[in-house]
């Protein structure tokens, strides 16, 4: 065996090659720390693998913010997240990093973000119309095309990491803790993304992946929204996850994929993969979801959920798909009328301070997938008694 066949991204391949080293060399990044006394924690919003997330108040201007207190992980990983957030700041639909503070006692870093009045996705996704799905998918694509153009893969695209303020039709792509700089020919860790959204490349242990990983995850989100099946590929473990995919996309194309890249499949798959035909997308349509499905939706989905990462649409190609024609037309009309609401990043003043325009923001839904720590008061900030009570 000569090893796997190398692969390079079809777009934005050499972005980081043409940037100065300090752009992508996050290990050398010097973090500028803000003042932790500027923030008062209000209540806990959620916890994840790598962090705890709180709603807080910036007491210098009385604005709501979100504070993500990082668990003690490798300094390198924290620096990577910070550098990526700083590089992407101001980009369309990218969550804005407003400040970085550190508790002087515990030395635990905390990231301060603009506040988004989020609706929990499990409730929201059941209420979205066909147009809503197109609209929000297009908004995610703006964020993905931007980060890809900046040489960055998100690597954890999933509903929990998409904050939607439905009332204001505002969307933000959050949690850049697993994001990484793309360098052609580099082999990456396949232990990224959440199981239901892991691309086949991760499941077959192909390490030379690229931005197209995010497009698979987006395809999984689209399928779950239009078919009202959450998650769409429901594997019980990483091996079963590939089996669930093969039962839809078929085993023939899977074997073509592993042959093309000379991938050696884990012997554990021998007993569980079986032989499956490729299913037509129409078979997932029923009376409860047919109002969300159209020929262009199925065509778009088909062009995202491909085994071969090089065959998937890029974010920019996806934005040009007929599925988005109505959204593009509406946004063009609104921007010519000077009112392109949710389609553009909020003003930089608003970004730095959180969204002040919402008079009485309702509570953020739990950030269930967010990265987290045990010490509720690790910022050394007085926390109201109820702050840790609400999950």
UniProtKB/Swiss-Prot annotation:
Keywords: Apoptosis, ATP-binding, Biological rhythms, Cell cycle, Kinase, Nucleotide-binding, Nucleus, Phosphoprotein, Serine/threonine-protein kinase, Transcription, Transcription regulation, Transferase, Wnt signaling pathway. Residues 36-41 are annotated as: Interaction with beta subunit. Gene3D superfamilies: Phosphorylase Kinase, domain 1, Transferase(Phosphotransferase) domain 1. This is Casein kinase II subunit alpha. It comes from Rattus norvegicus (Rat). It comes from the Eukaryota. Heterotetramer composed of two catalytic subunits (alpha chain and/or alpha' chain) and two regulatory subunits (beta chains). The tetramer can exist as a combination of 2 alpha/2 beta, 2 alpha'/2 beta or 1 alpha/1 alpha'/2 beta subunits. Also part of a CK2-SPT16-SSRP1 complex composed of SSRP1, SUPT16H, CSNK2A1, CSNK2A2 and CSNK2B, which forms following UV irradiation. Interacts with RNPS1. Interacts with SNAI1. Interacts with PML. Interacts with CCAR2. Interacts with HIRIP3. Belongs to the protein kinase superfamily. Ser/Thr protein kinase family. CK2 subfamily. Phosphorylated at Thr-344, Thr-360, Ser-362 and Ser-370 by CDK1 in prophase and metaphase and dephosphorylated during anaphase. Phosphorylation does not directly affect casein kinase 2 activity, but may contribute to its regulation by forming binding sites for interacting proteins and/or targeting it to different compartments. The gene is Csnk2a1.
